[in-house]
Amino acid sequence: MKIYLVGGAVRDALLGLPVKDRDWVVVGSTPQEMLDAGYQQIGRDFPVFLHPQTHEEYALARTERKSGSGYTGFTCYAAPDVTLEDDLKRRDLTINALAQDDNGEIIDPYNGLGDLQNRLLRHVSPAFGEDPLRVLRVARFAARYAHLGFRIADETLALMREMTHAGELEHLTPERVWKETESALTTRNPQVFFQVLRDCGALRVLFPEIDALFGVPAPAKWHPEIDTGIHTLMTLSMAAMLSPQVDVRFATLCHDLGKGLTPPELWPRHHGHGPAGVKLVEQLCQRLRVPNEIRDLARLVAEFHDLIHTFPMLNPKTIVKLFDSIDAWRKPQRVEQLALTSEADVRGRTGFESADYPQGRWLREAWEVAQSVPTKAVVEAGFKGVEIREELTRRRIAAVASWKEQRCPKPE
Protein backbone atom coordinates (compact mmCIF):
# COMPACT_ATOMS: atom_id res chain seq x y z
CA MET A 1 0.00 0.00 0.00
CA LYS A 2 1.29 3.44 -0.97
CA ILE A 3 -0.40 6.73 -0.12
CA TYR A 4 -0.09 9.98 -2.09
CA LEU A 5 -1.37 13.51 -1.58
CA VAL A 6 -3.16 14.48 -4.81
CA GLY A 7 -5.00 17.19 -6.67
CA GLY A 8 -5.82 20.64 -5.36
CA ALA A 9 -3.67 20.47 -2.24
CA VAL A 10 -0.54 19.80 -4.32
CA ARG A 11 -1.51 22.41 -6.92
CA ASP A 12 -2.23 25.20 -4.45
CA ALA A 13 0.87 24.50 -2.37
CA LEU A 14 3.00 24.83 -5.51
CA LEU A 15 1.23 28.11 -6.33
CA GLY A 16 1.90 29.41 -2.83
CA LEU A 17 -1.81 29.51 -2.03
CA PRO A 18 -3.47 28.35 1.21
CA VAL A 19 -4.34 24.66 1.19
CA LYS A 20 -7.88 24.11 2.47
CA ASP A 21 -8.68 20.44 1.88
CA ARG A 22 -6.30 17.54 1.43
CA ASP A 23 -7.23 14.48 -0.61
CA TRP A 24 -5.27 11.25 -0.72
CA VAL A 25 -5.00 8.34 -3.14
CA VAL A 26 -4.17 4.85 -1.91
CA VAL A 27 -2.42 2.55 -4.41
CA GLY A 28 -2.22 -1.23 -4.03
CA SER A 29 -4.89 -1.68 -1.37
CA THR A 30 -8.40 -3.13 -1.04
CA PRO A 31 -11.56 -1.97 0.76
CA GLN A 32 -11.17 -4.70 3.36
CA GLU A 33 -7.57 -3.70 4.08
CA MET A 34 -8.71 -0.08 4.59
CA LEU A 35 -11.52 -1.15 6.94
CA ASP A 36 -9.13 -3.36 8.90
CA ALA A 37 -6.84 -0.33 9.35
CA GLY A 38 -9.69 1.62 10.96
CA TYR A 39 -10.82 3.72 8.00
CA GLN A 40 -14.54 4.42 7.59
CA GLN A 41 -16.01 3.86 4.11
CA ILE A 42 -18.22 6.69 2.83
CA GLY A 43 -18.23 6.17 -0.95
CA ARG A 44 -21.13 4.19 -2.36
CA ASP A 45 -20.19 4.18 -6.04
CA PHE A 46 -16.45 4.00 -5.50
CA PRO A 47 -14.28 3.26 -2.46
CA VAL A 48 -13.59 6.44 -0.50
CA PHE A 49 -12.66 6.31 3.18
CA LEU A 50 -12.26 8.70 6.09
CA HIS A 51 -9.03 8.59 8.08
CA PRO A 52 -9.75 7.50 11.67
CA GLN A 53 -7.94 10.51 13.18
CA THR A 54 -7.84 13.35 10.63
CA HIS A 55 -11.14 12.48 8.88
CA GLU A 56 -9.52 13.44 5.57
CA GLU A 57 -10.64 11.54 2.47
CA TYR A 58 -8.59 8.60 1.22
CA ALA A 59 -9.69 7.06 -2.10
CA LEU A 60 -8.47 3.81 -3.61
CA ALA A 61 -6.78 4.40 -6.95
CA ARG A 62 -9.37 3.92 -9.67
CA THR A 63 -10.14 4.26 -13.34
CA GLU A 64 -13.41 5.40 -14.88
CA ARG A 65 -15.11 4.33 -18.09
CA LYS A 66 -17.95 6.18 -19.81
CA SER A 67 -21.10 4.06 -19.60
CA GLY A 68 -23.93 6.56 -20.08
CA SER A 69 -24.80 10.17 -20.79
CA GLY A 70 -23.99 13.23 -18.71
CA TYR A 71 -21.61 13.63 -15.81
CA THR A 72 -22.92 10.65 -13.80
CA GLY A 73 -22.69 8.00 -16.52
CA PHE A 74 -19.40 6.41 -15.47
CA THR A 75 -18.37 2.92 -14.38
CA CYS A 76 -15.62 2.85 -11.77
CA TYR A 77 -12.88 0.21 -11.43
CA ALA A 78 -10.83 0.16 -8.24
CA ALA A 79 -8.34 -2.63 -7.55
CA PRO A 80 -4.77 -3.10 -6.30
CA ASP A 81 -3.46 -3.22 -9.89
CA VAL A 82 -4.60 0.35 -10.68
CA THR A 83 -1.49 2.54 -10.75
CA LEU A 84 -1.10 6.12 -9.59
CA GLU A 85 -0.66 7.19 -13.22
CA ASP A 86 -3.93 5.45 -14.11
CA ASP A 87 -5.73 7.33 -11.36
CA LEU A 88 -4.25 10.71 -12.26
CA LYS A 89 -5.14 10.24 -15.94
CA ARG A 90 -8.89 10.38 -15.19
CA ARG A 91 -8.59 13.91 -13.74
CA ASP A 92 -9.72 16.99 -15.62
CA LEU A 93 -6.68 19.27 -15.84
CA THR A 94 -2.96 18.59 -15.82
CA ILE A 95 -2.47 20.98 -12.89
CA ASN A 96 -4.89 18.78 -10.92
CA ALA A 97 -3.14 15.55 -11.97
CA LEU A 98 -0.19 16.04 -9.64
CA ALA A 99 0.71 13.86 -6.66
CA GLN A 100 3.18 14.05 -3.79
CA ASP A 101 4.66 11.07 -1.96
CA ASP A 102 5.53 10.89 1.73
CA ASN A 103 9.05 12.17 0.97
CA GLY A 104 7.70 15.34 -0.60
CA GLU A 105 8.58 14.29 -4.14
CA ILE A 106 6.19 15.46 -6.87
CA ILE A 107 4.88 12.85 -9.31
CA ASP A 108 3.91 14.54 -12.57
CA PRO A 109 3.10 12.12 -15.41
CA TYR A 110 1.13 14.66 -17.50
CA ASN A 111 3.30 17.82 -17.37
CA GLY A 112 1.19 19.58 -14.77
CA LEU A 113 4.28 21.35 -13.41
CA GLY A 114 5.04 22.81 -16.83
CA ASP A 115 1.47 24.00 -17.22
CA LEU A 116 1.56 25.51 -13.72
CA GLN A 117 4.70 27.40 -14.66
CA ASN A 118 3.19 28.54 -17.97
CA ARG A 119 -0.15 29.37 -16.32
CA LEU A 120 -2.11 27.03 -18.59
CA LEU A 121 -5.36 25.17 -17.92
CA ARG A 122 -5.00 22.09 -20.14
CA HIS A 123 -7.01 18.85 -20.14
CA VAL A 124 -5.22 15.63 -19.28
CA SER A 125 -6.72 13.37 -21.95
CA PRO A 126 -9.56 13.15 -24.50
CA ALA A 127 -11.66 11.59 -21.71
CA PHE A 128 -12.22 15.18 -20.56
CA GLY A 129 -14.91 15.36 -23.25
CA GLU A 130 -16.96 12.63 -21.56
CA ASP A 131 -17.96 14.81 -18.59
CA PRO A 132 -19.91 18.00 -19.43
CA LEU A 133 -19.51 19.32 -15.89
CA ARG A 134 -15.84 19.89 -16.71
CA VAL A 135 -16.78 22.78 -19.01
CA LEU A 136 -18.09 24.64 -15.96
CA ARG A 137 -15.19 23.52 -13.79
CA VAL A 138 -12.61 24.86 -16.22
CA ALA A 139 -14.51 28.15 -16.48
CA ARG A 140 -14.50 28.33 -12.68
CA PHE A 141 -10.77 27.56 -12.48
CA ALA A 142 -10.15 30.29 -15.07
CA ALA A 143 -12.00 32.75 -12.82
CA ARG A 144 -10.31 31.50 -9.67
CA TYR A 145 -6.78 31.83 -11.05
CA ALA A 146 -7.23 34.77 -13.43
CA HIS A 147 -5.33 37.06 -11.06
CA LEU A 148 -2.31 34.75 -11.41
CA GLY A 149 -2.38 35.01 -15.20
CA PHE A 150 -3.85 31.61 -16.02
CA ARG A 151 -5.52 31.03 -19.38
CA ILE A 152 -7.17 28.06 -21.04
CA ALA A 153 -5.08 26.10 -23.55
CA ASP A 154 -6.35 26.49 -27.11
CA GLU A 155 -6.94 22.77 -27.56
CA THR A 156 -8.89 22.60 -24.29
CA LEU A 157 -11.13 25.51 -25.28
CA ALA A 158 -11.67 23.83 -28.66
CA LEU A 159 -12.73 20.62 -26.91
CA MET A 160 -15.10 22.59 -24.68
CA ARG A 161 -16.68 24.06 -27.83
CA GLU A 162 -17.09 20.59 -29.31
CA MET A 163 -18.78 19.37 -26.13
CA THR A 164 -21.14 22.34 -26.13
CA HIS A 165 -22.05 21.98 -29.79
CA ALA A 166 -22.64 18.24 -29.30
CA GLY A 167 -25.34 19.04 -26.73
CA GLU A 168 -23.45 17.53 -23.79
CA LEU A 169 -24.32 20.42 -21.46
CA GLU A 170 -28.01 19.60 -21.74
CA HIS A 171 -27.35 16.62 -19.46
CA LEU A 172 -26.34 18.87 -16.55
CA THR A 173 -28.86 19.22 -13.74
CA PRO A 174 -29.89 22.74 -12.64
CA GLU A 175 -28.47 22.07 -9.18
CA ARG A 176 -24.99 21.32 -10.56
CA VAL A 177 -25.03 24.34 -12.85
CA TRP A 178 -25.98 26.60 -9.95
CA LYS A 179 -23.42 25.01 -7.61
CA GLU A 180 -20.59 25.72 -10.05
CA THR A 181 -21.96 29.20 -10.75
CA GLU A 182 -22.25 30.02 -7.07
CA SER A 183 -18.69 28.86 -6.51
CA ALA A 184 -17.47 30.96 -9.46
CA LEU A 185 -19.26 34.00 -8.04
CA THR A 186 -17.09 33.77 -4.92
CA THR A 187 -13.85 34.15 -6.90
CA ARG A 188 -11.85 37.33 -7.34
CA ASN A 189 -12.82 37.59 -11.02
CA PRO A 190 -16.27 36.03 -11.46
CA GLN A 191 -16.75 37.77 -14.81
CA VAL A 192 -14.10 35.45 -16.28
CA PHE A 193 -16.38 32.46 -15.64
CA PHE A 194 -19.11 33.92 -17.83
CA GLN A 195 -16.65 35.12 -20.48
CA VAL A 196 -15.23 31.60 -20.79
CA LEU A 197 -18.73 30.17 -21.10
CA ARG A 198 -19.39 32.66 -23.87
CA ASP A 199 -16.10 31.79 -25.60
CA CYS A 200 -17.07 28.11 -25.82
CA GLY A 201 -20.74 28.68 -26.63
CA ALA A 202 -22.01 27.47 -23.26
CA LEU A 203 -23.42 30.84 -22.17
CA ARG A 204 -26.09 30.61 -24.86
CA VAL A 205 -27.08 27.15 -23.57
CA LEU A 206 -26.98 27.73 -19.82
CA PHE A 207 -27.56 31.49 -19.47
CA PRO A 208 -29.44 32.60 -22.62
CA GLU A 209 -30.76 35.70 -20.83
CA ILE A 210 -27.19 36.93 -20.33
CA ASP A 211 -25.93 35.80 -23.72
CA ALA A 212 -28.73 37.82 -25.37
CA LEU A 213 -27.18 41.05 -24.04
CA PHE A 214 -24.07 40.78 -26.21
CA GLY A 215 -24.47 42.87 -29.33
CA VAL A 216 -27.21 45.01 -27.78
CA PRO A 217 -26.04 48.66 -27.85
CA ALA A 218 -26.58 51.31 -25.20
CA PRO A 219 -26.16 55.10 -25.65
CA ALA A 220 -22.46 55.90 -26.04
CA LYS A 221 -22.88 59.02 -23.88
CA TRP A 222 -23.65 56.86 -20.84
CA HIS A 223 -21.97 53.65 -21.95
CA PRO A 224 -18.68 54.22 -23.80
CA GLU A 225 -18.28 50.43 -23.92
CA ILE A 226 -21.62 50.44 -25.87
CA ASP A 227 -22.20 46.65 -25.78
CA THR A 228 -24.59 45.70 -22.96
CA GLY A 229 -23.02 42.26 -22.56
CA ILE A 230 -19.59 43.81 -22.04
CA HIS A 231 -21.11 46.30 -19.59
CA THR A 232 -22.71 43.42 -17.68
CA LEU A 233 -19.38 41.66 -17.18
CA MET A 234 -17.73 44.97 -16.24
CA THR A 235 -20.38 45.57 -13.57
CA LEU A 236 -19.88 42.05 -12.21
CA SER A 237 -16.15 42.69 -12.00
CA MET A 238 -16.84 45.92 -10.12
CA ALA A 239 -19.34 44.22 -7.80
CA ALA A 240 -16.65 41.68 -6.91
CA MET A 241 -14.40 44.55 -5.84
CA LEU A 242 -17.16 46.15 -3.77
CA SER A 243 -18.62 43.10 -2.01
CA PRO A 244 -17.80 39.44 -1.30
CA GLN A 245 -21.51 38.55 -1.15
CA VAL A 246 -22.78 36.12 -3.79
CA ASP A 247 -26.25 37.70 -3.75
CA VAL A 248 -24.84 41.16 -4.51
CA ARG A 249 -22.69 39.79 -7.33
CA PHE A 250 -25.49 37.71 -8.85
CA ALA A 251 -27.97 40.60 -8.65
CA THR A 252 -25.47 42.84 -10.41
CA LEU A 253 -25.05 40.22 -13.14
CA CYS A 254 -28.82 40.26 -13.71
CA HIS A 255 -29.49 44.00 -13.40
CA ASP A 256 -29.82 44.75 -17.14
CA LEU A 257 -31.49 41.57 -18.41
CA GLY A 258 -34.46 43.65 -19.58
CA LYS A 259 -32.31 45.31 -22.25
CA GLY A 260 -32.30 42.00 -24.08
CA LEU A 261 -36.03 42.49 -24.70
CA THR A 262 -35.75 45.92 -26.34
CA PRO A 263 -36.82 45.79 -30.02
CA PRO A 264 -33.82 46.64 -32.25
CA GLU A 265 -35.69 49.56 -33.82
CA LEU A 266 -35.66 51.28 -30.39
CA TRP A 267 -31.92 50.81 -29.81
CA PRO A 268 -29.84 52.25 -28.21
CA ARG A 269 -32.51 53.45 -25.75
CA HIS A 270 -34.00 50.98 -23.28
CA HIS A 271 -36.86 52.76 -21.57
CA GLY A 272 -38.42 50.62 -18.84
CA HIS A 273 -35.81 47.90 -19.06
CA GLY A 274 -35.64 47.54 -15.28
CA PRO A 275 -39.18 46.33 -14.59
CA ALA A 276 -39.11 44.42 -17.90
CA GLY A 277 -36.11 42.45 -16.68
CA VAL A 278 -37.85 41.16 -13.55
CA LYS A 279 -39.58 38.34 -15.45
CA LEU A 280 -36.28 37.29 -17.02
CA VAL A 281 -34.65 37.21 -13.58
CA GLU A 282 -37.47 35.00 -12.34
CA GLN A 283 -37.17 32.77 -15.41
CA LEU A 284 -33.42 32.31 -14.99
CA CYS A 285 -33.68 31.70 -11.24
CA GLN A 286 -36.51 29.21 -11.59
CA ARG A 287 -34.63 27.24 -14.24
CA LEU A 288 -31.42 27.03 -12.20
CA ARG A 289 -33.24 26.71 -8.86
CA VAL A 290 -31.44 29.71 -7.43
CA PRO A 291 -32.09 30.15 -3.68
CA ASN A 292 -35.05 32.43 -2.96
CA GLU A 293 -33.10 35.08 -1.05
CA ILE A 294 -30.63 35.49 -3.92
CA ARG A 295 -33.46 35.54 -6.47
CA ASP A 296 -35.42 38.16 -4.53
CA LEU A 297 -32.50 40.59 -4.37
CA ALA A 298 -31.84 40.14 -8.10
CA ARG A 299 -35.47 40.99 -8.86
CA LEU A 300 -35.31 44.15 -6.74
CA VAL A 301 -32.04 45.29 -8.30
CA ALA A 302 -33.40 44.79 -11.81
CA GLU A 303 -36.50 46.80 -10.95
CA PHE A 304 -35.02 49.67 -8.93
CA HIS A 305 -31.38 50.28 -9.96
CA ASP A 306 -32.26 53.09 -12.36
CA LEU A 307 -34.49 54.72 -9.75
CA ILE A 308 -31.57 54.89 -7.32
CA HIS A 309 -29.41 56.56 -9.97
CA THR A 310 -31.95 59.44 -9.99
CA PHE A 311 -31.98 59.77 -6.20
CA PRO A 312 -31.73 63.61 -6.01
CA MET A 313 -34.90 63.86 -8.12
CA LEU A 314 -36.94 61.54 -5.91
CA ASN A 315 -39.43 63.14 -3.57
CA PRO A 316 -39.49 61.99 0.09
CA LYS A 317 -42.68 59.98 -0.43
CA THR A 318 -41.07 58.00 -3.27
CA ILE A 319 -37.98 57.35 -1.16
CA VAL A 320 -40.02 55.92 1.70
CA LYS A 321 -42.08 53.91 -0.78
CA LEU A 322 -38.82 52.47 -2.13
CA PHE A 323 -37.93 51.28 1.37
CA ASP A 324 -41.39 49.70 1.58
CA SER A 325 -40.97 48.01 -1.80
CA ILE A 326 -37.68 46.37 -0.90
CA ASP A 327 -39.01 45.33 2.54
CA ALA A 328 -36.19 47.26 4.18
CA TRP A 329 -37.95 47.47 7.55
CA ARG A 330 -37.66 43.69 7.93
CA LYS A 331 -34.54 43.21 5.81
CA PRO A 332 -32.42 46.33 6.34
CA GLN A 333 -29.39 44.71 4.65
CA ARG A 334 -31.11 45.26 1.31
CA VAL A 335 -30.45 48.99 1.46
CA GLU A 336 -26.71 48.39 1.50
CA GLN A 337 -27.03 45.69 -1.15
CA LEU A 338 -28.93 48.00 -3.51
CA ALA A 339 -26.44 50.79 -2.89
CA LEU A 340 -23.57 48.46 -3.84
CA THR A 341 -25.21 47.00 -6.94
CA SER A 342 -26.18 50.45 -8.21
CA GLU A 343 -22.63 51.69 -7.63
CA ALA A 344 -21.27 48.67 -9.54
CA ASP A 345 -23.62 49.56 -12.41
CA VAL A 346 -22.31 53.12 -12.63
CA ARG A 347 -18.64 52.24 -12.22
CA GLY A 348 -18.82 49.21 -14.51
CA ARG A 349 -18.39 51.41 -17.58
CA THR A 350 -15.35 52.32 -19.63
CA GLY A 351 -13.78 55.43 -18.11
CA PHE A 352 -16.02 55.42 -15.02
CA GLU A 353 -14.20 52.76 -13.00
CA SER A 354 -13.12 55.28 -10.33
CA ALA A 355 -16.24 57.43 -10.43
CA ASP A 356 -17.83 58.67 -7.22
CA TYR A 357 -21.35 57.44 -6.54
CA PRO A 358 -22.99 59.88 -4.10
CA GLN A 359 -26.41 58.31 -4.70
CA GLY A 360 -25.28 55.35 -2.63
CA ARG A 361 -24.39 57.62 0.30
CA TRP A 362 -27.69 59.48 0.04
CA LEU A 363 -29.64 56.22 -0.05
CA ARG A 364 -27.88 55.01 3.10
CA GLU A 365 -28.37 58.35 4.87
CA ALA A 366 -32.06 58.54 3.95
CA TRP A 367 -32.51 55.02 5.27
CA GLU A 368 -30.88 55.88 8.59
CA VAL A 369 -33.21 58.86 8.93
CA ALA A 370 -36.35 56.92 7.98
CA GLN A 371 -35.70 53.90 10.17
CA SER A 372 -34.82 56.06 13.19
CA VAL A 373 -38.43 57.28 13.45
CA PRO A 374 -39.70 55.44 16.58
CA THR A 375 -42.77 53.24 16.26
CA LYS A 376 -43.25 53.45 20.00
CA ALA A 377 -43.90 57.20 19.84
CA VAL A 378 -46.69 56.65 17.31
CA VAL A 379 -48.37 54.05 19.52
CA GLU A 380 -48.03 56.25 22.60
CA ALA A 381 -49.64 59.11 20.68
CA GLY A 382 -52.84 57.06 20.62
CA PHE A 383 -52.88 55.75 17.06
CA LYS A 384 -54.42 52.31 16.63
CA GLY A 385 -54.65 49.59 13.94
CA VAL A 386 -53.95 50.75 10.40
CA GLU A 387 -53.56 54.29 11.73
CA ILE A 388 -50.21 53.29 13.24
CA ARG A 389 -48.82 52.32 9.85
CA GLU A 390 -50.21 55.42 8.16
CA GLU A 391 -48.86 57.80 10.82
CA LEU A 392 -45.49 56.04 10.89
CA THR A 393 -45.23 56.45 7.12
CA ARG A 394 -46.20 60.13 7.38
CA ARG A 395 -43.51 60.76 10.02
CA ARG A 396 -40.90 58.89 8.00
CA ILE A 397 -41.71 60.99 4.93
CA ALA A 398 -41.44 64.17 7.01
CA ALA A 399 -38.09 63.08 8.46
CA VAL A 400 -36.70 62.23 5.01
CA ALA A 401 -38.00 65.56 3.66
CA SER A 402 -36.17 67.46 6.40
CA TRP A 403 -32.97 65.50 5.78
CA LYS A 404 -33.23 65.94 2.01
CA GLU A 405 -33.60 69.69 2.35
CA GLN A 406 -30.36 69.89 4.31
CA ARG A 407 -28.18 67.10 2.92
CA CYS A 408 -29.21 66.11 -0.59
CA PRO A 409 -28.50 68.47 -3.49
CA LYS A 410 -31.48 69.72 -5.43
CA PRO A 411 -31.75 68.46 -9.02
CA GLU A 412 -30.71 70.95 -11.66
UniProtKB/Swiss-Prot annotation:
Reaction catalysed by this enzyme: a tRNA precursor + 2 CTP + ATP = a tRNA with a 3' CCA end + 3 diphosphate; a tRNA with a 3' CCA end + 2 CTP + ATP = a tRNA with a 3' CCACCA end + 3 diphosphate
Keywords assigned by UniProt, alphabetized: ATP-binding, Hydrolase, Magnesium, Metal-binding, Multifunctional enzyme, Nickel, Nucleotide-binding, Nucleotidyltransferase, RNA repair, RNA-binding, Transferase, tRNA processing
PROSITE patterns attached to this UniProt entry: HD (PS51831)
Domain of life: Bacteria
Stored InterPro entries: CCA_bact, HD/PDEase_dom, HD_domain, NT_sf, PolA_pol_head_dom, PolyA_RNA-bd, tRNA_CCA-adding_enzyme
Role noted for this protein: Catalyzes the addition and repair of the essential 3'-terminal CCA sequence in tRNAs without using a nucleic acid template. Adds these three nucleotides in the order of C, C, and A to the tRNA nucleotide-73, using CTP and ATP as substrates and producing inorganic pyrophosphate. tRNA 3'-terminal CCA addition is required both for tRNA processing and repair. Also involved in tRNA surveillance by mediating tandem CCA addition to generate a CCACCA at the 3' terminus of unstable tRNAs. While stable tRNAs receive only 3'-terminal CCA, unstable tRNAs are marked with CCACCA and rapidly degraded.
Recorded domain comment: Comprises two domains: an N-terminal domain containing the nucleotidyltransferase activity and a C-terminal HD domain associated with both phosphodiesterase and phosphatase activities.
Protein known as: Multifunctional CCA protein
Taxonomy of the source species: Bacteria, Pseudomonadati, Pseudomonadota, Gammaproteobacteria, Enterobacterales
